[in-house]
Amino acid sequence: MMVKVYALTTCPYCRMARRFLDENSVAYDVIEVDGFEGDEKKAVVEEVRSLTGGTSFPVVLIGDEMIVGFNKSRMQELLNL
């Protein structure tokens, strides 16, 4: 199952989501939005906005499902943990 996380390096909830995935040995791709600059950053922010309608973090994509923010119980449910 594909897992992707849009995160900010300064976001405590992003760190919690990533720590949860790491502790449960879940493979995932991470996009650190604040690691981009200029047009690249604008493009990534627009990608997040198109997914969520806003710019809240983290955005966790698990298969076809999306979680905005850190929601441990929902992540457990979607990952069958």
Regions found by a protein language model. Give the residues of each.
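A local structural micro-motif
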Residues: 29, 56-57
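A short, hydrophobic beta-strand/beta-hairpin element that forms part of a small beta-sheet core
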Residues: 58-67
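A basic- and aromatic-enriched beta-loop-alpha substructure that forms the phosphate/nucleotide-
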Residues: 72
